[in-house]
Amino acid sequence: TFDNYLVGKTQGEYLVDALDLENADGPFNLEIITGDPGDNNVNFFYGGAMDVLQPYIDEGKLVVPSGQIAKEEVATANWATDAAQSRFENILSSNYADGTNLDAVLASNDSTALGVENALAANYTGEYPIITGQDCDIANVANIVAGKQAMSVFKDTRALASQVVEMVDAIISGEEVPVNDTETYDNGTGIIPSYLCEPVAVTIDNYK
């Protein structure tokens, strides 16, 4: 599988760099959106990103005007674009209607990012925020090209397939199966040894 904690960490680190949080005074306004609360991957996406961003929130360099920070508050049922759009329309009308700038949106994936982008198009007049995503959906890559989304995280299934072939060959040959993670995935009966492939950050500079 892919290293989903690293997906979130990559998104968080992108925002740190894009906002120059190490050097800039701030504060910067941030809003957060993740996926379905029943999807275990959300724990990794959200956890990886917040491990990076929480210190800046605690410091006051990042501010969340909506006050919605907890995973349960920022979840999106079924990862649905329309649900993401509806929530962000409410956030924008309640916190940004006076022209306050939204500086960044941590969106765990592209379907939620698209909902954010749709809400911004209809309900926002400030400077356009930096928005993250994941999956490199066609609509979102188009938005990256158009300057409406800063980045997405690409998980190359070819790399996944190649690793699966290598692992199956090892099993058939009676050799040791290559794994690089023996801590992350617990199915309730024990830890499942895994091989975590690395995702890639995609921006306007490398999307081709």
Predicted regions and their residues:
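A residue-level marker of the well-folded mature domains of exported/periplasmic proteins
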Residues: T1-K208
